[in-house]
Amino acid sequence: AWYNNQFALIPVQTIYELNYINGKAHRYGIEREDGEPFTVAALYEIVKIGEQIVRSMTMLTTNADNHPFMLQFHKPEDEKRSIVVIEPEHRQDWLNMHHEDAFELLKPMGAGYVAEHLPKPKKPLKTAQMDVFNG
């Protein structure tokens, strides 16, 4: 996908990362300070396997070992990673870029993001009535 210039953007409101506090994983949501959505650099691929067409995408990340904000996420012993955010003024460039030029936009996310502890929501208990109406 990289060498075929199959660049994509994934619009997001929040991304989730784990922050390890006292050895325990805590789920955090990361958003822009202004609450606006943002776009993550991605690659896409469409392949035919037998008679089936398979579509896939991957978000791009970059090393964040020295990133002042992203350094807090992932296990302490693991490499720190940051998604690559494509700013609005570069979105069209990213989609039309040649892979040899794309490295200039592969940077860790910039300033202007906040993290909030967001525990995973608990699943509601199923009742017989819910099963009847929800299949």
What are these model-predicted stretches?
Residues A1-G135:
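A structured binding-face within diverse protein domains that lines the active/interaction site
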